[in-house]
Amino acid sequence: MSALTIYSETETREPLWHSTDAAEIADKLNARGVRFERWEADRDLGQDPAAETVINAYQHAIDKLVAEKGYQSWDVISLRADNPQKEALRAKFLNEHTHGEDEVRFFVEGAGLFCLHIDDQVYQVLCEKNDLISVPAGTPHWFDMGSEPNFTAIRIFDNPEGWIAQFTGDAIADAYPRLP
C-alpha cells in the first residue's frame, strides 16, 4: 500500500503526518509541486521481464507523458534481491542528490521509498505498483530500494542521456527510517 510520511528536518523519528490514502498523498505532494498519481499497471509481464517487454507493455503510458511534458527518453530499472550489485546500488541511491530535470517513475512491479527533502521537512513516499511520481528538477532527494529489492519502474527523462545526479554531500538520509 502506498504511503506518505512527513517528518521534520530536526525530528527524524516522530512523524508529523502519515497517510495511506492515495488522494491525501496526492494532495500533500501536489501542494509541494510533486506529482503523484495512481495509474494502472495491469499487464502480465512474467517473471523478471526484459526492459523491452516492459516498455512495449506500457508504451501507451509513456506516450501520454511524452505528449504532456515533452520527455525525450525512457528506460526501465528493475532490481531483484539476487542482483549482485544491489548493495552498491542501494548505497548510491541513498545519498541525497538532485537532478537538472524532473525525476519521473512509474512503478509497474514492487516498491521503493522516495525521500524528498523539501524546505525543513522530509517527505517519505512509499511508491508501489501503480504509482506514478514526478519529483521536480532541483529537489533534494534519495531513494531506498531496501536490502532485498524487488521492483520494476519505467524511468522517463527530459535529457536523452538519462539519469544524471548531482550529489549534495548532505548526510541527512542517514537520520531517517529506511526500508528493511
From Swiss-Prot:
Site May play a role in metal incorporation in vivo: which residues? E96
Q: In which pathway does it act?
A: Amino-acid biosynthesis; L-methionine biosynthesis via salvage pathway; L-methionine from S-methyl-5-thio-alpha-D-ribose 1-phosphate: step 5/6
What the record notes about the co-factor is:
Binds 1 Fe(2+) cation per monomer.
EC number, as in UniProt = 1.13.11.54, 1.13.11.53
Entry cofactors = Fe(2+); Ni(2+)
Feature type site, description May play a role in transmitting local conformational changes:
D102
Q: Quote the catalytic activity from the record.
A: 1,2-dihydroxy-5-(methylsulfanyl)pent-1-en-3-one + O2 = 3-(methylsulfanyl)propanoate + CO + formate + 2 H(+); 1,2-dihydroxy-5-(methylsulfanyl)pent-1-en-3-one + O2 = 4-methylsulfanyl-2-oxobutanoate + formate + 2 H(+)
Which molecular function term from Gene Ontology is one that the record holds? acireductone dioxygenase [iron(II)-requiring] activity
Positions bound to Ni(2+): H97, H99, E103, H141
**Functional description taken from the UniProt entry:** Catalyzes 2 different reactions between oxygen and the acireductone 1,2-dihydroxy-3-keto-5-methylthiopentene (DHK-MTPene) depending upon the metal bound in the active site. Fe-containing acireductone dioxygenase (Fe-ARD) produces formate and 2-keto-4-methylthiobutyrate (KMTB), the alpha-ketoacid precursor of methionine in the methionine recycle pathway. Ni-containing acireductone dioxygenase (Ni-ARD) produces methylthiopropionate, carbon monoxide and formate, and does not lie on the methionine recycle pathway.
**What's this protein's family per the entry?**
Belongs to the acireductone dioxygenase (ARD) family.
Assembly: Monomer.
Protein name per Swiss-Prot or TrEMBL: Acireductone dioxygenase
Native source organism of the sequence: Enterobacter sp. (strain 638)
